[in-house]
Amino acid sequence: MSLALQIRSKDASETRKVSVDYTDKLESSETLTGSVTVAEQTTSDLTLTSPGVNSGSVTINGRTVAASASVSFTVAGGSAGKVYTVQVTVSTSNSQTFVDDLKLQVV
């Protein structure tokens, strides 16, 4: 398991799309496949919906990411002043499974 370096943030009243770039973890010609699982760790304050592998290219933090090299999901809720951990699990075409913890700060 790895911990994403960037802490994402959202306002408690917002519903936001979160995207995660896996380009640097994928081997040459490897892609993300199958279903994506997202789960909040420790509490149930957040509502996490619509997890999936992006079917087209997307831009994440100013970087163009190829189709099937990133995942996205929607997050709502949370209490202001708290930092949450969201675990993302996704499989690849080379039979790897990535499990990553993302930090989400609610302001």
Language model features with spans:
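Short, solvent-exposed loop/turn segments at the edges of extracellular beta-sandwich modules
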Residues: 91-95
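Low-complexity "stalk/linker" and mucin-like segments enriched in Ser/Thr/Pro/Ala/Gly
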Residues: 41-68
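Short, conserved beta-strand segments of beta-strand-rich sandwich/propeller modules, principally
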Residues: 83-87
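Predominantly extracytoplasmic/ectodomain segments of secreted and cell-surface proteins
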Residues: 1-31
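Surface-exposed, short loops/turns at beta-strand junctions within beta-sandwich domains
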Residues: 75-82
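Extracellular acidic loop/turn motifs
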Residues: 24-35, 43-47
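Short strand-edge motifs at loop-to-beta-strand transitions and within beta-strands
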Residues: 69-73
